[in-house]
C-alpha cells in the first residue's frame, strides 16, 4: 500500500473534501446561526426579573430613613406608642415618607420595645430566683448546724442520765445496808417481869423503858449487870 492510500484511510477529509458533502456543510452553518440567535434573544422572564431587581433597589433606597427622620420618629414614639391613621398621615407628610412606611416603622418599634421589656422582666425574675436559691442554701446550712447541736445535746443528756442512774443505784444499796442496823437498833425487847421484880422496878415504868430499848442498849445493860454480879441471880430465876 502506498503512502497516499494510507493517508486517505487515516484522514478521509483529505480524500473527500467539503464539496462532496454539501448538505452537511449547510446544516452546520444553520446550527451555528440558530445558536447565535438564541444567545441574542433575551427571555421575558429574565427581563422582568432584572426590572424587578432594579425596582427593588429603588424601593430599598426609598425605605431607608435618614438620621433626622429616625430621630423624629423616635421622639414621636416616646410621646405615643400607637398612632391613629390621621397622625400617621401627618407624620408621613412632615417627613416626606409613605404612611404605610411610618406604620411599619411604629409596628417594628413596638415589637422591639416589648422585647426589651420582656428581657428586663426576665432579668429581674432571674435575680430574684438567684436570691431565693442563695437564701435556701443558707437555711439548709443553718438546719444542718442545728441538727448537729441537737445531736450533741441528746448525747450529753444521755450521759447525764447514765451518771444519775449509776449514782442513784449506789446510794440505794448503801442505804439498804445501813438501814438494817438502824432498824435493829430501834427494835423492841420483850418485857421480863422477873427482872422487874428482881431489881424492884415498877412494872409500868419498866415496861415503858424496855419497850423503847434497842438490842444494843439491852446487851450493854446485860453486860453491866453481869459485871456487877447480878447475872447469877437472874439465871437462877429463869432456871
From Swiss-Prot:
Chief place where the protein resides: nucleus
Source organism, top-level taxon: Eukaryota
Record-level Gene Ontology MF annotations: DNA-binding transcription factor activity, RNA polymerase II-specific; sequence-specific DNA binding
CDD domains: homeodomain (cd00086)
Residues covered by region (Disordered): 22-65
InterPro entries to which the protein is assigned, alphabetical: HD, HDZip_class_I_plant, Homeobox_CS, Homeodomain-like_sf, HTH_motif
Stored Pfam families: Homeodomain
Gene3D superfamilies listed in its UniProt record: Homeodomain-like
Entries under SUPFAM superfamilies matching the protein: Homeodomain-like (SSF46689)
Residues in the DNA-binding region annotation: 58-117
Keywords, sorted A to Z: Coiled coil, DNA-binding, Homeobox, Nucleus, Transcription, Transcription regulation
Gene Ontology biological process terms in this record: positive regulation of DNA-templated transcription
Family: Belongs to the HD-ZIP homeobox family. Class I subfamily.
PANTHER family in UniProt: HOMEOBOX-LEUCINE ZIPPER PROTEIN (PTHR24326), HOMEOBOX-LEUCINE ZIPPER PROTEIN HOX12 (PTHR24326:SF545)
Protein name from the UniProt record: Homeobox-leucine zipper protein HOX12
Organism (species): Oryza sativa subsp. indica (Rice)
Amino acid at each position: 500500500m502506498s503512502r497516499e492510500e494510507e493517508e486517505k484511510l487515516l484522514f478521509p477529509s483529505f480524500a473527500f473534501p467539503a464539496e462532496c458533502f454539501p448538505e452537511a456543510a449547510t446544516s452546520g452553518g444553520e446550527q451555528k446561526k440558530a445558536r447565535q440567535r438564541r444567545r441574542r434573544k433575551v427571555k421575558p422572564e429574565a427581563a422582568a426579573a432584572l426590572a424587578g431587581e432594579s425596582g427593588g433597589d429603588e424601593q430599598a433606597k426609598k425605605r431607608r430613613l435618614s438620621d433626622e427622620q429616625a430621630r423624629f420618629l423616635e421622639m414621636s414614639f416616646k410621646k405615643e406608642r400607637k398612632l391613629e391613621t390621621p397622625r400617621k398621615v401627618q407624620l408621613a407628610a412632615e417627613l416626606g415618607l409613605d404612611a404605610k412606611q411610618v406604620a411599619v416603622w411604629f409596628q417594628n418599634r413596638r415589637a422591639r420595645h416589648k422585647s426589651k421589656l420582656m428581657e428586663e422582666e426576665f432579668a429581674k425574675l432571674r435575680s430574684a430566683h438567684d436570691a431565693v436559691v442563695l437564701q435556701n442554701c443558707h437555711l439548709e446550712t443553718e438546719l444542718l448546724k442545728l441538727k448537729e447541736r441537737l445531736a450533741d445535746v441528746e448525747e450529753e443528756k444521755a450521759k447525764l442520765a447514765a451518771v444519775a442512774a449509776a449514782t442513784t443505784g449506789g446510794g440505794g444499796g448503801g442505804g439498804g445496808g445501813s438501814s438494817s442496823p438502824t432498824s435493829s437498833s430501834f427494835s423492841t425487847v420483850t418485857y421480863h417481869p422477873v427482872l422487874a421484880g428482881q431489881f424492884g422496878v415498877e412494872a409500868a415504868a419498866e415496861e415503858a423503858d424496855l419497850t423503847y430499848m434497842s438490842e444494843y442498849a439491852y446487851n450493854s445493860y446485860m453486860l453491866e449487870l453481869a459485871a456487877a454480879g447480878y447475872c447469877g441471880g437472874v439465871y437462877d430465876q429463869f432456871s
